[in-house]
Amino acid sequence: MMYHIPGVLSPKDVARFREQLEQAEWVDGRVTTGAQGAQVKNNQQVDTRSALYAALQNEVLNAVNQHALFFAAALPRTLSTPLFNRYQNNETYGFHVDGAVRSHPQNGWMRTDLSATLFLSDPQSYDGGELVVNDTFGQHRVKLPAGDLVLYPSSSLHCVTPVTRGVRVASFMWIQSMIRDDKKRAMLFELDTNIQSLKSRHGESEEILSLLNLYHNLLREWSEI
């Protein structure tokens, strides 16, 4: 399943990010990809050795960790270190699949269950640059408002189309979920969102408490901690 997570960063935060990223040191984006991805990748990334990078990636981690909808959809166990990329002048990233595992500074290795892109450029400011994701439900083309995030299975083939005007800047990361199976995770998300909707409309009740108990028992049964 693919999820649109709105408002991860406020407009004020997005403007500050963009201003700071204009001063960043950018390097060839192929430094962080494997042999297969390097053949189709043509973009730039912020140098991960810079002090600015360290500060901004911490802010992204804090923002997603505090976003209730992100947590409900991803049920994260481990988040990768966020990276930042830039596309301009017809730069693109052809169809590829993300690696199944990635190194992690604290945990050694993590499994990539979900991929996330946090858009930092207004969609009207550039042409092209759609994230195209192929999954079992077909092909999806994604170009979200700045500050919004898209979450999708890392097992999906995906690409970024050429940016023919303007500049597309984004942050991206990977998530190891407490729930490895996409279908089970989707069922838990649907159950959770419906419980929250019922609570907002009708308040607390024995039936809602029973559904909440079911949710946590399923999470207990399926989670890998």
From Swiss-Prot:
Which cofactor names does the annotation list?
A: Fe(2+); L-ascorbate
Q: What keywords tag this UniProt record?
A: Dioxygenase, Iron, Metal-binding, Oxidoreductase, Vitamin C
Q: Name one GO biological process term.
A: intracellular iron ion homeostasis
Root EC class = oxidoreductase
Q: Name one Pfam family in it.
A: 2OG-FeII_Oxy_3
- Coiled coil feature spans: none
Query: Carries keyword Nucleotide-binding?
Result: no
E.C. number(s) listed in UniProt: 1.14.11.-
Co-factor remark: Binds 1 Fe(2+) ion per subunit.
List of residues binding Fe cation: 96, 98, 158
GO molecular function list: 2-oxoglutarate-dependent dioxygenase activity; iron ion binding; L-ascorbic acid binding
Give the top-rank taxon of the lineage listed in the UniProt record for this protein. Bacteria
SMART domains from the xrefs? P4Hc (SM00702)
Which sites bind 2-oxoglutarate? 168
**Domain (Fe2OG dioxygenase) ranges:** 78-177
UniProt protein name: PKHD-type hydroxylase YbiX
